[in-house]
Amino acid sequence: AAIPQLKTDPSKLSILIKSGVLSTRLTTSLAFEYNYTLQVLLLDYSGHPDAVMLPIVMWRRQHQPDLLDNPDRQTKAVRFEADFLTATTVDLAIELDLTENVFTRPRPGVGGGMDVIHKAEPVHPSVQPFSEEWSLWFRDELLAQWNHDPRP
């Protein structure tokens, strides 16, 4: 976990799909697209909001760059609400509008068989890959850090 508080207590994080739509067209292949709202809930969160939002921005740049390119969607694709519990803690709800393309192709050697492929988003020309290790600081406070495998 990039966020230290969630590394200590992962039960404070809940992720669910709030609503979804399956889009498909009558074509020769069985391709479709998931369109859904992912809801991320952080309970009793006492950290800096940037420690949550920056990893989301980083993830979106790599995995949903089309949302950042579309002026109609870029300002609405991530929404959030905070319920202040105390002077230092909140329940933070974040909603992300996401898409995922799914394709099929005939499976070699299996009559009538198909392989399902969840295609990765193409790399946007303006997106530079992030380093495998990064940290986020606000003044002298470490807000978040992450070591990740850069392979798609």
Locations of regions flagged by a protein language model:
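Extracellular/virion structural assembly segments
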Residues: 1-12, 17-19, 26-35, 39-92, ...
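Glycine-rich, aromatic-bearing surface loops/beta-hairpins
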Residues: 107-152
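Residue-identity detector for glycine
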Residues: 20, 47, 109-113
